[in-house]
A protein has these predicted regions:
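N-terminal, charged/glycine-rich beta-strand/loop interface patches
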Residues: 1-254, 265, 269, 329, ...
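Redox cofactor-anchoring modules in respiratory/redox and cofactor-processing assemblies
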Residues: 239-240, 267-356
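Short gly/pro-enriched beta-turn/loop segments at secondary-structure junctions
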Residues: 249, 256-260, 293-297
Length: 432
């Protein structure tokens, strides 16, 4: 029987797909409360995890079938960690097969996904239980430890001495959920950039639906997923699977935060809505490769849209996050526009803003894929999409190397046919 609200505090081993056992189902219109654990660095240095994240296991949604879509309304997000550590990575030679996020092994005894123990602090604190050698497949070339003051809304990076003190109490500062199995990266004790202040503006790097193929959770996107094509490890996929089965759940788009609406494709029965990889803050692009991963509590509300067969997520960000030309028309503006149109003898096209996600191995390929996806969704030529994006939208970088948001003012008559008009009108309080 479907539940009106589900608490999800259970995590994958780094792999997500049709094999992953789902919680639920949650009722159509119900809520999911996710207790998330940090993504990126903690899972990256944990030898037993088979992906670059440790996302929550998916939740089935009542009535969701392949070929439908699920509307995910992001209601709240609370940062739980007291500190975070991040930086630019460098893989350790010999500590992986093909992909250091996925196919980890001890660089000395060659044991795949070795059991481990943490001894002391520092970048070599994670040791293989079998032979005793340092076993993390990554080092942090330049990194920082940041203390977070959620009440005041900012964080400050600390010096090496304070970072070492935090490392000694890594579990306390990280506030990992009880069922998380990662090593908190705070044990590294990095303090290369002290005294830097940043505003806390949290969001989820992972929020979406389950892909139709079993893959590492961090690779459920068109950029990282590209590395799985014919890869030399058990999670290799074909180019056809790459193009067909991924759902772009790993966006790292900083507008996936409270007040946003994400509309995601259903590619397995029940949709399998999952979350993870919460960040305390991030500028467009996540140019360092990683940012301030934190444990968090997120609440979303879900609703099934029957027959809306999507290739990729559609994002309705908070209005203040929209680029200037994509912002919704307000009543006074619209009345003036109608008057001007009457003077010209024209009929105005009612429109609404939305963002189509583009993804690919490079940022240019991601943009082109975003245009193609928007073309298919809206039933217009790629050339028309490009013209509309140019004068009523924008292309924004979500993550390097290959996630973009293609903003466009889409004709309302088309959104009505898709079953999206009411959702967008209510979200942006449009004057139509």
């Amino acid at each position: 029987m479907a539940e009106s609200e589900i608490l999800n505090d259970v995590f994958t081993n780094g792999v997500i797909g049709p094999h992953t056992r789902m919680l639920g189902p949650v009722a159509d219109g119900g809520r999911i409360k996710f207790l998330t654990t940090p993504g990126c660095w903690g899972p990256m240095i944990t030898p037993t995890l088979r992906g670059g994240h440790e996302v929550n296991v998916p939740v089935a949604v009542e009535g969701a079938r392949v070929g439908d879509a699920v509307v995910v309304r992001f209601e709240s997000l609370k940062v739980l960690s007291k500190a975070s550590s991040s930086g630019v990575d460098k893989p350790v030679e010999g500590a992986f097969v093909g992909d250091p996020y996925v196919a980890k092994r001890c660089p000395v005894c060659r044991e795949p996904w070795p059991e481990f123990e943490v001894v002391g602090i520092g970048q070599e604190a994670v040791h293989c239980k079998r032979c005793g050698a340092p076993a993390s497949p990554f080092r942090m070339v330049h990194g920082y430890t940041m203390l977070l003051d959620q009440a005041r809304g900012f964080g400050v990076t600390v010096d090496a001495a304070k970072a070492a003190q935090v490392a000694e109490r890594a579990a306390e500062y990280a506030q990992l959920p009880p069922k998380s199995r990662q090593v908190p990266v705070l044990v590294f004790g990095k303090g290369d950039m002290p005294g830097v202040a940043a505003r806390v503006r949290p969001f989820l790097g992972q929020l979406g639906s389950t892909p139709a193929v079993n893959i590492p959770d961090s690779h459920n996107a068109g950029d990282f997923g590209y590395f799985l094509i014919d890869a030399p490890h058990p999670y290799s996929i074909t180019k056809e699977q790459y193009e067909r089965d991924l759902t772009d759940g790993h966006l790292d788009v900083d507008s996936v935060r409270p007040g946003s609406v994400l509309i995601v494709p259903v590619k397995v029965k029940g949709a399998g809505i999952y979350a993870g990889d919460a960040h305390a803050m991030q500028g467009d692009g996540e140019v360092a490769g990683h940012t301030t991963d934190v444990a968090a509590e997120a609440v979303v509300q879900v609703e099934v849209v029957k027959g809306l067969n999507l290739e990729c997520p559609i994002l309705l960000p908070p209005e203040e996050d929209l680029p200037p030309l994509a912002k919704p028309w307000r009543e006074e503006e619209w009345e003036e526009l109608k008057q001007y149109a009457r003077e010209l003898g024209l009929e105005l096209e009612e429109s609404a803003p939305l963002q189509v996600i583009g993804s690919g191995p490079t940022i240019n390929e991601a943009a082109e894929r975003g245009f193609a996806r928007a073309s298919k969704l809206l039933g217009m030529s790629v050339e028309e999409v490009k013209n509309r994006v140019t004068i009523t939208g924008a292309v924004e970088i979500g993550r390097l190397p290959g996630i973009v948001q293609v903003s466009i003012q889409a004709p309302l008559r088309i959104l009505e046919k898709l079953g999206l008009a009411d959702i967008v009108i209510k979200h942006y309080r449009l004057p139509y």
